[in-house]
Amino acid sequence: MKIRCFCIVLIVSGALLTEVNNNRSLSGDNLLVVNNLQSSK
């Protein structure tokens, strides 16, 4: 179950990052958030 949830999180975060890449002014902040989430796990 945890692996499945983790895969879903990766897919959703990937989709969000692709949308964020369109708005490059926000990409830096969101990358920091993603890095913090990965390091917390």
UniProtKB/Swiss-Prot annotation:
Give the main localization category: membrane
Tell me how this protein sits in the membrane.
Single-pass membrane protein
UniProt keywords (A-Z) are: Cell inner membrane, Cell membrane, Membrane, Toxin-antitoxin system, Transmembrane
Membrane-spanning parts: 1-17
* Superkingdom per UniProt: Bacteria
Q: Which cellular component terms (GO) are annotated to the entry?
A: plasma membrane
Provide the disulphide bond pattern.
Answer: none
* Compartment annotation: Cell inner membrane
Function as written in the Swiss-Prot or TrEMBL entry: Putative toxic component of a potential type I toxin-antitoxin (TA) system. Neutralized by sRNA antitoxin TimR which binds to the 5' UTR of timP mRNA and inhibits translation. The antitoxin gene is encoded immediately upstream and transcribed divergently from the toxin gene; antitoxin RNA is less stable than timP mRNA.
Family of the protein in this entry? Belongs to the TimP toxin family.
This one is known as Putative toxic protein TimP
Upper classification of the organism: Bacteria, Pseudomonadati, Pseudomonadota, Gammaproteobacteria, Enterobacterales
Gene name per UniProt: timP
